[in-house]
Each structure stands twice: as C-alpha cells, then as structure tokens.
C-alpha cells in the first residue's frame, strides 16, 4: 500500500474511532500556510488537534514515536493559526492517534 493511501486510510479509521467516542469533527486535513493538521475535533469544551500516525508494523518503531519534538512544535504553531481564526477562546489539547495495522491507540494530552 502506498504511503499516502496508508495515511488516508489511517485518518478515516481515526475519524470513525473518534465519532464512536463522541467527538465532533470540525476539520479534516486543515491546511495552513505552515502545514496541515490531520484532524481538528471538539471534545467537550476542548478543541483537539489530532495527529494521526499509521504503520503496518513496528519494524521502524511505534507510530506515535514519530511525533517528535520538532513535529510537536509545528503542530503548536498550526494550532495557534487555527485558534486565531475562531471568534471565541477554547482550551486546546494535542492528541496522537497511533494505528499499527488495525489496532488504534488514542493518546490524549500527548504533549503540551
């Protein structure tokens, strides 16, 4: 399976999972001048910025480990851009959804 195809399928699995948990999906593949946020959702009062990582095996490490410090800093910048567009302030949370084959691990508050 091609990398982009794998990623898109992973995002669909993540969205389906989030909907079953009661999240409201606000944006998918939200593009900014600085990059893209995989999923933006609402969980209670929180705006949740969600990075989805999918791998078919752990051969190159667990998927969640690829959300390193540099990626975290980029996601924070992207979140600021999104939040600045809203007319109301919301608390923000950063989650990671790691998918290995079809197993989903949801890491809430993965970083701040």
Curated annotation (Swiss-Prot):
Gene Ontology MF term list: nucleic acid binding
InterPro entries, per the entry: Restrct_endonuc-II-like (IPR011335), tRNA_endonuc-like_dom_sf (IPR011856), UPF0102_YraN-like (IPR003509)
Domain of life (superkingdom): Bacteria
Cleaved signal peptide residues: none
CDD domains attached to this UniProt entry: PoNe_Nuclease
Annotated Gene3D superfamilies: 3.40.1350.10
Pfam family for this entry, one: UPF0102
Family: Belongs to the UPF0102 family.
Protein name stated in the entry: UPF0102 protein THEYE_A1950
Organism, scientific name: Thermodesulfovibrio yellowstonii (strain ATCC 51303 / DSM 11347 / YP87)
